[in-house]
Each structure stands twice: as C-alpha cells, then as structure tokens.
Swiss-Prot record:
Pfam families listed in its UniProt record: KRAB, zf-C2H2, zf-H2C2_2
Oligomeric and partner information: Interacts (via KRAB domain) with HDAC2; the interaction is direct. Interacts (via KRAB domain) with HDAC1.
PANTHER family according to UniProt: C2H2-TYPE DOMAIN-CONTAINING PROTEIN-RELATED, ZINC FINGER PROTEIN ZIC AND GLI
Record remark: domains: The KRAB domain is necessary for its repressive activity.
Protein name: Zinc finger protein 431
PROSITE patterns: KRAB, ZINC_FINGER_C2H2_1, ZINC_FINGER_C2H2_2
C-alpha cells in the first residue's frame, strides 16, 4: 500500500467542440510515477479556443482551476512563471510547468478552498488566474499533512473541499468519473454551436482557398480535399477525383451498374440519391414550396431554380456572346453551341447531343417506355413534365400569363414564343434561304423543306411527315381521338390550335390589328393574308395560266377549277 499514491488523470471522450477532448477527472490508485499538470489539462489550438464564447471560456477556466486544486491536494505544485498570455503567441491556451515532486506532500492552500468559481467577467487567461491566486498564498496559510498514503488518511481541514471529498471514495477497485462540470460545459457548447447556425457567422476560414465554415469540424473535413486533391484516378479513362466515393460512382458509367432499385416499379439507378428523388414520383410528395407563389417541388434544387423567376436575376453571362442565364448549368450547355461540342452520344444509334437531358429523352425512342400515365384519360407519357403539361388540357389551367396583353398559356415555352409577337424578334435564321423564325422547332421544320426529308412515318397508312408532332396529330385521324374540348359548347378537336381558334368565336376577341387600316382579326394568319391587300403582294403563282394570287387558298381554288374542267372534258370525250 505504501508503494501506491492516489492520482488524477484525464479520461478522453468526444465532446461537442471540434478537436477538443473532454477530460473527466478519474481517481484511482496506480503505481508511483511523476504526475504533471499537463496530465489533467485540456489543450486547445487558437482556432478551437476562439470557437468558445466568453461563458464557455470562463467555465473552462473553472474546470481547470478545480483540476489545479486537486493536484495541489495530491502533491503537485505549479511554478510561478511570468504571466504571458499564451493565446497571443498562438500556442495552447494552458501551458504550465510544475516543480519536481517534493519528498513530502505539499501544503493545501486555504485561499483556493474559499470559493470554487472565479469572477464571471474575468478576461485574463487561465494561466494568469492561477498565478494571481497562487501568488497570494503565504507560508503561514499552508497547512502541511505529512506521510499520507491514501485519500481517506488525509484529513481535510477546509470546508471548501467537502464537495471534492464527496466525489472521492476509498474503494480502490473502482473508478469514479466526476462529470459535474463536463455536463454543463457540453450544454453550453451545443447551445453556442446551434446559435452559430442561425447567425450565419463563419469564423473558420481555409487558408488555401478562402472558403469559410461555421464549425471547426467542417473546416477540418474540408482541408482533406486539398490534401488528397485528385488522388483517386479512374483506371478506365484516367479521370481523377478528390473522393473515393466519387470515383466509385464514376466507375458505374463504364460498368453500367445500377445497384439502387425502386421496389415500386423496378427501375434501377446508379446513385441512391437519384432513387430517393425517383420515389417521390410514386408518392406525389412535393415538400419544397415557394413562399412567393405557393408552387411546390419535389426537389430543393428545382425550388432554387424556380425562385429566380420571381427575382429575374441572371448572374451567369456568356463571355462569347454576352447572353445571360439564371443557372450555371444552362450557361455550360449554352457554351456547347459556340464550341459545336456534343459530348453525349447514344450507344444505340451513335446520335450525339449537347445536353445529357436530350440524350435521355432520345433513348426513350429506342425503348418506347411510357411510365407516366394520366389518371383522367389513361394516356401514357415518357416524362413526368409531359404528363404535367397534358393534365392542363383536362383542368384548363394556364399559369403563364403575358404581361403585355394578358393572354395566358399552359406552357412557359408558348408564353416565350408569344412574347416575340410584341417584340417582333425572330432569332432563328435559316442559313439556306435567310428566312427567320421565333422558335427553333419552326426553323428545324423549315430546313426539311430544303432537304425534303420526312423521317416520321405513319404505320397505319404509310404517310410520312417532317415532324413528329405532325405525325402525332395525323394519327388522330385513324383513332378518331379529339382530346381538346371546348368548355363553352362541348365541341372537341384533335388539335389544341383548332380549339384555341374556336374559343375566339365565344369571346369575340380580335387581338391582331392591321397597322395600315386598323382592321382587327382573331387570327394572326388572317392578318397576314389581309396585309397583302395593302402591299398588293401575290406570291402564289399558277403554273397553268400564270395568274397570281395573294392567298394560297385562292390558288388551290383555281387549280381545282382547272381540274374540274379537265375532268369534264375527259368525260365528254369518253362519251363520244
């Protein structure tokens, strides 16, 4: 028993503060060895110390003061070194040297036993507190107790150590952690971390790239990016990544592996996050709602993109042509136009695209998959966005309104096209003949006039068309489908444009006005025909008689009259 001395040592556990180690005082018997103040001191870096607010710093000093009392109680003294603030030297906040262990246990200072808590508004470092209080100790205040082999042999003479004695027991076989201060410290620490998130303060800055963080832990994690920059390389294509997990996901591009499968429909994905997003299709959940207009989305990124509609902000500008965009991804895609780059290639037919979304849409041509079904009419679609647009046919919803004339549309693209009527803008020009259009699909359709290509063929009658939309409309002739119904009179149409024209009968609206004579029309095509009266333009020429007409319909009538006359003549000759 004489070979044993009662000691204090730190028990290290994870705490709320990044990088810090929570030290619990543990009292146990161990073989006689040199004990230092560092053994029970918690050491912080400058960044970690700045993480604490004044209340936490005070609490920390109180805990360390208690540790110091315990060491004095057990026979460890601390030297009186100059009170230099360690924080100013960017060293650990608490760094104290001790005297060598004395032959006999040192005295217990009565000054330390008077109170357990230092001043609440103390600004000094803990080292200065210790030195100031230790300096007040005089020899007459020291009460020595020699030859103590254990704690219970040492009789406490000051009331200030009553609480300390309660934490200690004379049982040599057990270890009792005293976490009286640690619990309070942990509570303060979590409260401070929570407050930092609300204030948006980011005190921890990366010296390499300048990025700031609100927590030291996040900065530590971020620093690993610089340490292991591009350290994980793909053996297949040589592309390098900062994270092993990113490399693992990348490899699936080469292997085609899709380990994350939807239990509802069996569709598989390369990433778990994509599967999570996909599942919302089945549940219909849209947890992300716009505070401005109330519109809801199933992805936070979609909400972020949507918000820019209200602000009108376009921070991403093309250096080549000056065009601005509200998304960085849209700018990246736009740049492919200038470069002529088409990095996304279809493995089935080798067709290339400048957008990944275009490739994805294209692939459905080969698979014929239509997983999105309309509950109203049972029609299937290969895209959820297409289904959303289709549903507006049944509901009559037109959320996109023109600010100039008040006309509403069920698709944003239709509103964009409509606005060009007011501006007169036609940005899409044919290189072959110079004709300009306000929509790129119109230019694409026009180009086929020059090539004569008709890739879309009707399986029913074999008729070919230059556009897939025209083929879709044509098929309704065979099926008799008329999905566009007038709510006013119940009349149905196989084209939405026909329904739009029909509705004007009920409203009497004539929004297309002739600038020359002021006459108004309910259709833009009628206005175009009318204008030829003023210009005396007659672009339609009859090959039979060289007569010219200002309307194609008049030319058709002329041709029909020739055809009827020819037919009558042939019949007359047959009767002779």
């Amino acid at each position: 028993m004489d070979d044993l001395k009662y000691g204090v040592y730190p028990l290290k556990e994870a705490s709320g503060c990044p990088g810090a180690e929570r030290n619990l005082l543990v009292y146990s018997y161990f073989e006689k060895e040199t004990l230092t103040f560092r053994d029970v001191a918690i050491e912080f870096s400058l960044e970690e110390w700045e993480c604490l607010n004044p209340a936490q710093q005070n609490l920390y000093m109180n805990v360390m003061l208690e540790n110091y009392k315990n060491l004095v109680f057990l026979g460890v003294a601390v030297s009186k070194q100059d009170p230099v603030t360690c924080l100013e030297q960017e060293k650990e906040p608490w760094n104290m040297k001790r005297h060598e262990m004395v032959d006999e246990p040192p005295a217990m200072c009565s000054y330390f036993t008077k109170d357990l808590w230092p001043e609440q508004d103390i600004k000094d470092s803990f080292q200065q507190v210790i030195l100031r209080r230790y300096g007040k100790c005089e020899h007459e205040n020291l009460q020595l107790r020699k030859g103590s082999a254990s704690v219970d042999e040492y009789k406490v003479h000051k009331e200030g150590y009553n609480e300390l004695n309660q934490c200690l027991t004379t049982t040599q076989s057990k270890i009792f952690p005293c976490d009286k201060y640690v619990k309070v410290f942990h509570k303060f620490l979590n409260a401070n971390r929570h407050k930092t998130r609300h204030t948006g303060k980011k005190p921890f800055k990366c010296k390499k790239c300048g990025k700031s963080f609100c927590m030291l832990l996040h900065l530590s994690q971020h620093k690993r990016i610089h340490i292991r920059e591009n350290s994980y390389q793909c053996e297949e294509c040589g592309k390098a990544f900062k994270w092993f997990s990113t490399l693992t996901r990348h490899k699936r591009i080469h292997t085609g592996e899709k380990p994350f499968k939807c239990e509802e429909c069996g569709k598989a994905f390369k990433q778990s996050s994509t599967l999570t997003t996909h599942k919302i299709i089945h549940t219909g959940e849209k947890p992300y709602r716009c505070e401005e207009c109330g519109k809801a989305f199933n992805r936070s990124s979609h909400l972020t993109t949507h918000k820019i509609i209200h602000t009108g902000e376009k921070p991403y500008k093309c250096e080549e042509c000056g065009k601005a965009f509200n998304q960085s991804s849209t700018l990246s895609t736009h740049k492919f136009i200038h470069a002529g780059e088409k990095p996304y290639k279809c493995e089935e037919c080798d067709k290339a695209f400048n957008r990944f979304s275009y490739l994805t849409k294209h692939k459905i041509i080969h698979t014929g998959e239509k997983s999105y079904k309309c509950e109203e009419c049972g029609k299937g679609f290969n895209w959820s966005s297409t289904l959303t647009k289709h549903k507006r046919i049944h509901t009559g919803e037109k959320p996109y309104k023109c600010e100039v004339c008040g006309k509403a549309f069920n698709e944003s693209s239709n509103l964009t096209t409509h606005k060009m009527i007011h501006t007169g803008e036609k940005p899409y020009k044919c290189e072959e003949c110079g004709k300009a259009f306000n929509r790129s699909p119109q230019l694409t359709a026009h180009k086929i006039i020059h090539t004569g290509e008709k890739p879309y063929k009707c399986e029913e009658c074999g008729k070919a068309f230059s556009q897939s939309s025209i083929l879709t409309t044509h098929k309704r002739i065979h099926t008799g489908e008329k999905p566009y119904k007038c709510e006013e009179c119940g009349k149905a149409f196989n084209r939405s444009s026909n329904l739009t024209k029909h509705k004007i009968i009920h409203t009497g609206e004539k929004s297309y006005k002739c600038e020359e004579c002021g006459k108004a029309f309910n259709q833009s095509s009628t206005l175009t025909k009318h204008r030829k009266i003023h210009t005396r333009q007659k672009p339609y020429n009859c090959e039979e008689c060289d007569n010219t007409f200002n309307q194609s319909s008049n030319l058709i009538k002329q041709n029909n009259s020739y055809w009827r006359e020819t037919l009558q003549m042939s019949r007359m000759w047959e009767s002779l």
